[in-house]
């Protein structure tokens, strides 16, 4: 399982372990809702539920969508969290702690109160069941 930079490691620039897919910088993608890599809470859809999740220049998983199962997407529809066989990748930070949202102060209202930790645990359980 790779989160943020850990997900990038699965891509063609690094270990190249994905079948028919790549991990690419989300801020460079068509239709992205952000062009800046700085920490922020961005809109994602995780299994049908819209969330604001901590983002810090994370990756999108692109390629043949029949080769992986998409668990979450970014606002532009790119895959943000995927499972491919025994590989699980997440571009944002569901593991984020409350302290991550303290600076800058405008992010304080976006802390998830642990909801994202539950999403991450469910994701890990799905991955281990593969």
Segments predicted by a language model, with ranges:
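Residue-identity detector for glutamine
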Residues: 12, 25, 47-49, 84, ...
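Generic detector of leucine side chains in alpha-helical contexts
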Residues: 15-18, 27, 80, 89, ...
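Extracellular ligand-binding/catalytic regions of CAZymes and related secreted enzymes
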Residues: 86, 94-130
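Short, low-complexity, polar/charged sequence segments that are solvent-exposed and flexible
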Residues: 20-22, 36-37, 88-89, 106-111
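A glycine-rich, often tryptophan-bearing local segment used as a flexible ligand/cofactor-contacting loop or short
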Residues: 1-46
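Catalytic beta-strand/loop cores that center a nucleophilic Ser/Cys/Thr
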Residues: 35-101
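A broadly tuned preference for mixed-charge, low-complexity surface segments
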Residues: 2-7, 11, 49-58, 121-130
């Amino acid at each position: 399982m790779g989160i943020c930079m850990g997900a990038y490691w699965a891509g063609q620039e690094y270990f190249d372990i994905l079948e028919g897919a790549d991990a690419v910088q989300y801020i460079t993608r068509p239709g992205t809702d952000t062009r800046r890599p700085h920490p922020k809470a961005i809109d994602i859809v995780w299994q049908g539920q819209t969330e604001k999740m901590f983002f810090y220049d994370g990756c999108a998983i692109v390629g043949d969508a029949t080769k992986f199962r998409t668990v979450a997407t970014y606002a532009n529809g790119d895959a943000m969290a995927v499972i491919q066989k025994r590989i699980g990748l997440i571009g944002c930070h569901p593991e984020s702690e409350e302290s991550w949202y303290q600076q800058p102060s405008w992010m304080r209202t976006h802390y998830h109160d642990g909801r994202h930790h539950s999403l991450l645990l469910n994701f890990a359980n799905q991955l281990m069941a593969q």
